[in-house]
Amino acid sequence: MKQDLKSMTLAEMQDAFAAIGEPKFRAKQVFTWLHRGAVSFDAMTNLSKSLREKLDGLYDITAPSVARKQVSKLDGTIKYLWKLRDGNCVESVVMQYHHGNTVCISSEVGCPMGCKFCASTIGGLVRRLEPSELVDQVLFSQLDSGLPVSNIVLMGIGEPLDNFDNVMRFLELINSPDGMNIGMRHISLSTGGLVDKIEKLAERDLQLTLSVSLHSPDDESRSKIMPVNRRWPVDTLLAACRDYFAKTGRRISFEYTMIDGVSDSPEQAELLSKKLAGMGAHVNMIPLNNVTESGLHTSSRQAIHQFQSILEANGITATLRRTLGSDIDASCGQLRRKYEKT
């Protein structure tokens, strides 16, 4: 079975090339080609034909193909359905902002978390993505769209911290000066609240932004919509977040979906304010996007504004997320891993 060359760091690639009798500078040439979008060794024109044939016999550099591309008529958001080498599919989204272009990528095929308001978890987890498959979503989204990517959010299909090792390697690859060279401060990683992995991430002391999907400040309602809360209740999760902030100095963003009758009461706003006090936290409020299977509904505009006002009155920074790509089901919680019948 051929090795996945694009999942290797430059140092690993240099060692692999040395093991087959090739100089290190060749590895750097290949690394650069791969991270510029080369999909075959034949495209690497500064390599000899014999070396290209040799590498092709040893390594797999198969790129994903575009199974479907949708462009929002509302705001130009682009959603890609990528077909992977094994036939599985994942989605990623390119969003245009005044401050630059952001790509939202998936970390797994399917998702193990079971959140009731999210389409990505329907059907459960199939497999974790390889580092190369994360890189390719960023790279080929940029190449196909023609929009230079300046920011990455790991908020697509899957739980990034459930795929911890591969995601950490992806971060190293995407941050490499010889690769796409996207700075850590331009990367956001979202988690549903895997406390053990948050603790592990804190030890890495990375300069990325950690986004925690909270969605409720009380265990009763959070457990109903997020099964992970039964293992790591709200207070346990927030203790890990405080420790993360203390170790890294990086402010945490809390994702908070506004769900009618579930997470939007004034009492919950007061409780959330109390539990986040002193953390320098930012609350990113998200109107629930439609997922037919969930049976849940977004909060009223009045409830959303009242909730936000209570947070701000208590000294908690809160913003309302702008919804992009809603006409192509590209908004938060709407990504799926396969074609939908129409």
Where are each of the predicted segments found?
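Auxiliary Fe-S-binding modules of radical SAM enzymes
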Residues: 1-88, 242-251, 256-342
